[in-house]
Amino acid sequence: QMCIRDRCNVGGITESMKVAGWCESHYIDMMPHNPLGPICTAASIHYGASVPNFAWLETRESSAENAGFFDDEIIQSSHKMQNAMYVVSDEPGLGIKVNEDYLKNSKFKQWDPPQLERNDGSVTNW
């Protein structure tokens, strides 16, 4: 069995670790949902290194998928994939540096993700 959950939806790294503890007591492995680029990836790598039942990490490292998410001009990350896995960085914090000057001079484009509803009207993930 596998628990696939998103740190953003569950309340952050601390709450994710609590979910992992509950899952571990039921012999369920963790596979973090990782859809949001290099900052989310860095947090996921550190989370994976901190829980004993971490199994896999969803990632967007293919050239067809990354769509600029891993642009070194915007975010410098010490996390690089090696032999189909990430090595945990010894850099402080999450091991990333955000180029704030680049972002200040960039144009912001608002985007709202689709909000899907089930037949009964309840909200669901997309």
Predicted segments with their positions:
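Short, acidic/turn-prone active-site loops that include or flank metal/cofactor-
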Residues: R7-V10, E61
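Flexible C-terminal active-site loop/helix
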Residues: P38-W126
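Active-site-adjacent beta->alpha loops and helix N-cap segments on the catalytic face
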Residues: V10-W22
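Short, small-residue-biased leader/transition segments that mark boundaries at the very start
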Residues: M2-I4
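Short glycine/serine/threonine/alanine-rich loop segments
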Residues: Y27-I28, N53
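A contiguous pocket-lining binding segment that forms or flanks enzyme active sites
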Residues: M31-H33, H46
